[in-house]
């Protein structure tokens, strides 16, 4: 599969390249000279059709692909195009919670064309104002709470439209090992790339990176500088600054935010990718080519990053230099959660020889990755299992919801549980994880049995009846994601 521009920059897990193939890092790209006009000015007075909007973005994409230093001077009219705004509106979740204005998707849609025309005019004349983000907290698997931002509906529409336009530029720039929140890329493609790299490259050490509070601490000043590498349209830059400076509303109080971008906003994933593209991706690619003495693999999904090294000395040196680089851009590696562990085909024997027990494991995108040897031939492979606390957290959610649905009709609850189990299997259904899938299905059935017994005046329903309900409504686990090496599913 090709990159967003139609061509991959490099294989996701390439072998070490010659040292003279380096690429400029972020510092070398700042102040890249005079802005060049993009010659893509469109007549914004007419109402464009869907084909016009897509064709215009296609020209932006081709220009960005052709000239990697081109700075676009006229982009705002693509964003306030009625067709772009309309496509953005229909791409939003219909049942999403409202922001500070209380506006819902359905209510806004009752006067959609009038509302979009009004929004377009405000964007055109610079009268659009971003509203503060309503902050809510959701529980994490480890018991802590993650802050999320609920954006006002019109801000969602404008952000989604802007992301559509900016993706036309940045998808030609982003590197192959970046997977998070990009068109045509997914978590399982990142998992496949990591699995393939661990099995096909000479990897003996894994560096599991954790950036402390990344979304809360990225620098607005640096982010704007990075955006300006490609965007010379000051109106678009100011639009982004409006979102960054809108602040958050928490417990009825508006809080000014001077750093970070709230998780939950439509633009946040793209802005985060732009930030890490310049802070991490370009730098690590140059480091691999110029500094690494052995093989090195890289997989990044947003701020979740795993690297593999052939040489421990490379891993130690890289970690030290990355720590300094992160500090320059107002970021910090978590000193306890960032770990270097022996992991690879020799890890089991090496640790056994040194009396250190089994190799350590690491977590990535919901899976615990474990060093094992196949029983059939003793060869090294990577076992991927559902993270235990993730599984338990999901069961806790099911338990709480069953209490609320205790008196609902059995078929209605059965359909809901069917969707829960199917969704869980659809994500976690990888080879050698079948036992965890069966445990999840069994535990869901047990929780359902307990909920039914509480509403029954005759005690618990007999297990034979319960078994029939489980077999009818809870699908059996299946492998939804075959071995990456077998299906050649790595995106490059």
Which positions does each model-derived feature cover?
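Non-catalytic terminal/accessory segments
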Residues: 1-492
